[in-house]
Amino acid sequence: MLKTVLMPSPSKCSLMAKRDQDWSPNQLRLDILDQNARDADPRGTGFDYAEEFQELDLDAVKADLEELMTSSQDWWPADYGHYGPLFIRMAWHSAGTYRTTDGRGGASGGRQRFAPLNSWPDNANLDKARRLLWPIKKKYGRKLSWADLIVLAGNHAIESMGLKTFGWAGGREDAFEPDEAVDWGPEDEMEAHQSERRTDDGELKEPLGAAVMGLIYVDPEGPNGNPDPLASAENIRESFGRMAMNDEETAALIAGGHTFGKVHGADDPEENLGDVPEDAPIEQMGLGWENDYGSGKAGDTITSGIEGPWTQAPIEWDNGYIDNLLDYEWEPEKGPGGAWQWTPTDEALANTVPDAHDPSEKQTPMMLTTDIALKRDPDYREVMERFQENPMEFGINFARAWYKLIHRDMGPPERFLGPDAPDEEMIWQDPVPDVDHDLIGDEEVAELKTDILETDLTVSQLVKTAWASASTYRDSDKRGGANGARIRLEPQKNWEVNEPAQLETVLATLEEIQAEFNSARTDDTRVSLADLIVLGGNAAVEQAAADAGYDVTVPFEPGRTDATPEQTDVDSFEALKPRADGFRNYARDDVDVPAEELLVDRADLLDLTPEEMTVLVGGLRSLGATYQDSDLGVFTDEPGTLTNDFFEVVLGMDTEWEPVSESKDVFEGYDRETGEQTWAASRVDLIFGSHSRLRAIAEVYGADGAEAELVDDFVDAWHKVMRLDRFDLE
């Protein structure tokens, strides 16, 4: 007989202490960089997912998924006897959080399992979808990540219901904690409608991608809950555009996704649904949205509050969605869940859909305001009419757009695993040419570094060019970086932050060295401009260290190639243009976010730790590598020499700092004894003396005798940034 042991009620007390951030809400957050510094994976640092994945029998996994999808479970019955539509929604909502503005979100990491995503209203009841998958995840263990399984389940569901997909690639490693770096919006409550999410011009603020907090894209009822299709079309275009989807891809995705399944609103969600998973009682074991309406499942399911199917065959791929949308007229009404939805005015569609659970019942198709938007907006309608006339084109476009959706955050194809990945090179993957020559060795590297240092280029110019090339990398979606030398192409060559006139001079000099070297070779050894840009930065760092009395060699791995304009989507790369780069003391004039916050954001995208960020800023300042050669933060009488002068000044008490203006973006430093102005600084510079944690790190490098440690740590951090995109070396 089981014995019940009474435990204290969780409502009586809590041993969970307040965080420092709770006491000091304006404190600069470094926890997003701490995530880069620690390994939360319980399998340890030696775990190699790619190696484990190679042992996976993918066909066996898909067979298991097929059996699961067609085996309805009593605890959560499948609509129409098939879990395919539920799995498609799960995969879509996992990948659909991706936004191009900062590359964050997306399916990698499988973070739909964690707060806040697991408790978003738009993800209601997806906890059941993941719980259905647990036996498969349990079976394959470390060979198959949650991140891959979630997407694979949705991809195979499409094939199970009749459409051949474009392919699928594995390689998404699991995270074991939420990504604290993602800014989901300013709201304090889910689905709040407020202007703070938008600029004065009505545009979504960067880096946001969703129109409403807690929704993947837009409000299905229409903006602010108003059934206005044309206004909805504007929101759709903006939100999907932030995900790098054009009108054709957007229309294909919505039409294809809504070809399957139904929405659930048997009654009002607010009156019937319990707490979200993160707030639900412990005995619910991680499941949320407990439904007290009827049976709480099957025909009584409540998710969004909108109720009904789109087509007459909800688990078959066909043109039913497009035909219903375009061939019939629709009018708005409040459904049984109290939400706006659209019903056909033509009685011919009434009761034409089998009920999802009761074969004796029939339902009438419905549409969302976001569906009607595809009919009312002239540009979307043009695409939809073309798809209606050419069903095969519709299928191909959906398959390709779906593939892009679920792989957009994975980076280049070198990271893709498995036999189902297509061979086709797609421009949104930022392709670079294969290496078609022998690579330079140590002798050639030394020769080229000498050639570079014998030019008129300065340490600052070489360092800034290499940094500008490599620091476009975003670990969020594995885009950017030095490989490809796209800094010489549009749009990067004309970005303000890259100082186009100076950049042109540096690149011309390096291209001349490249041409002379390659033409002089009698063998197949060649050097790319991409490699030469990095090598120039390395040579400058070595020279700066030597001038400070330290003999160092910056590691260098050749093998980068030079991308062509045809391999470069100019509009796509505009998303990589930094709002600010605190490492160069640069910020756009229109930026209203504190510079130190943007520094941490940039450091996170570069996968840096607080220590690496600190040593890079201090080192770059000593090298004089600032935007437009500004004296902001260059606290040294010997710019171009790798010293710890920056830290000595920022930590010392000889200088008193005063803001230049009310905005407190720029500061002047005055000698406390003489009153003479000695230095100028940005917020990025002063944060290393102001912030307690950063000051503690800075003190390591600012101490007497610490310069050698600074040089070594700077070289390590510099090398890390230079090779962040070298997936070919992994």
Curated annotation (Swiss-Prot):
GO cellular component terms given for this protein: cytosol
Covalent cross-link site, Tryptophyl-tyrosyl-methioninium (Trp-Tyr) (with M-243): 92-217
EC number: 1.11.1.21
EC class name: oxidoreductase
Disulfide pattern: none
Cofactor: heme b
Chemical reaction(s) catalysed: H2O2 + AH2 = A + 2 H2O; 2 H2O2 = O2 + 2 H2O
Crosslink feature (Tryptophyl-tyrosyl-methioninium (Tyr-Met) (with W-92)) location: 217-243
Residues noted as binding heme b in the record, renumbered to the chain: 258
Active site: 93
InterPro entries in alphabetical order: Catalase_peroxidase, Haem_peroxidase, Haem_peroxidase_sf, Peroxidases_AS, Peroxidases_heam-ligand_BS
Post-translation changes: Formation of the three residue Trp-Tyr-Met cross-link is important for the catalase, but not the peroxidase activity of the enzyme.
GO molecular function: catalase activity; heme binding; metal ion binding
Annotated keywords: Heme, Hydrogen peroxide, Iron, Metal-binding, Oxidoreductase, Peroxidase
Marked site: Transition state stabilizer: 89
Gene Ontology biological process: cellular response to hydrogen peroxide; hydrogen peroxide catabolic process
Keyword Heme: yes
The organism's place on the tree of life at top rank: Archaea
Comment on bound cofactor: Binds 1 heme b (iron(II)-protoporphyrin IX) group per dimer.
Described function: Bifunctional enzyme with both catalase and broad-spectrum peroxidase activity.
Subunit structure: Homodimer or homotetramer.
Database matches in PANTHER family: CATALASE-PEROXIDASE, HYDROPEROXIDASE I, BIFUNCTIONAL CATALASE-PEROXIDASE
Family named by the database record: Belongs to the peroxidase family. Peroxidase/catalase subfamily.
Protein name: Catalase-peroxidase 1
Species of provenance: Haloarcula marismortui (strain ATCC 43049 / DSM 3752 / JCM 8966 / VKM B-1809)
